[in-house]
Amino acid sequence: MERGTSDEVGYATGLWHMVQAGLRELFPGYFALIMATGIISLACGMLGLPILAQALFRLNIVNYAVIATLMLARLIGYPRLMLADLTDHARGPGFFTSIAGSCVLGTQFVVIGHESSVAWILWGVGVTLSFTVIYAFFAAVTLRGVKPDLETGINGAWLIATVGSQSIAILSTLLLPTAGAYKTALVTFALIMYLMGCMTYLTIIPLILYRFTFFRLTPAELTPPYWINMGAVAITTLAGATLIMNAGRSSLLTAILPFLKGLTLYFWATATWWIPLLLILGVWRHLYRHFPLRYSPQYWGMVFPLGMYTACTIRLSQAVDLPLLAPVTPYLLAIALFAWSLTFAGLIHELVRDFGRPRLPESPARPH
């Protein structure tokens, strides 16, 4: 009996220390799980798979609640670590996923849940985070005295700034029917966020391509978030297509419709251009250089672009009347679902392993 009690106390102590260590080192970009699950759910709905779309929607509500709770717990328990991560060139952009995650879930509430009141709350969260997190990060990395060089300071996660802006543009456009007297203001805001997202992509992507081509790139440095090179323009395509499909609600959108169509096609072509190169780099990383393929939360940064490319291709084919794109979309969705399933299985395996064998840490990894 005493042995059993001692084991239970030891397990509980180990579990508590494991939770503390997990909060200290919590990956800032974990909202990418919500982004990936949400966009694949929406793509399933677009292709007539309502049961799967609903299941992923309900799962995403749980995902959001858990991750938001963990992030708040980390903010309360380890504010200095949160601030250090936010102002770090490499880890800081991960916080941008909270913007996109909130708005992607809000889009699910509109499209799948048919519940605009919750979507408005998530829209407010996304907009607030956009104007706090993004400007806090860029101000911090601009003003800090010691800065990394381009080789170590930039990565694909920087483009989540674009993803965040475009996710707000999409949700804002979808909320137009419930905006009432504020419809004109909301559609103008949606268009501004869309153009801001275009601006950030066109500003950041030359730096990433320059880093790719003129600096040594190791397998460890070729992280999954580099798929956001494609995902950022995929969501820009989806935002443009959403504005085009809702142009009848606004004289402003109607006036610039040819511009929107051309720009949207341009960004879809850019997203398509990236896919072969990213596949080649992935083969080089894992098959040629034998970099181990094991679960990391960063892989959600690869799953999201796959789902987003599927969704944007579906909507683009409808927005600009390009039916020739439609036949390929079920295959794109199958690939995205396969990638999501593997990554989610990796997450579950890691959780089962960690909670099954909690260990006492030797010492805290970083101070509060």
Which positions does each model-derived feature cover?
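Extended, compositionally biased non-globular segments
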Residues: 260-318
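Small-residue-rich transmembrane alpha-helices that serve as helix-helix interface/gating elements
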Residues: 63, 268-270, 327-342
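Hydrophobic, ordered structural segments
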Residues: 103-144, 173, 187-190, 203, ...
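Generic multipass alpha-helical transmembrane bundles of integral membrane proteins
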Residues: 158-281
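Extracellular/periplasmic helix-loop-helix junctions in multi-pass membrane proteins
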Residues: 50-51, 179-187, 247-258, 287-291, ...
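Juxtamembrane helix-loop boundaries in multi-pass membrane proteins
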Residues: 12-42, 57, 79-107, 123-126, ...
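Short, hydrophobic transmembrane alpha-helix segments
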Residues: 44-55
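Central hydrophobic cores of alpha-helical transmembrane segments in multi-pass inner-membrane proteins
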Residues: 61-76, 130-139
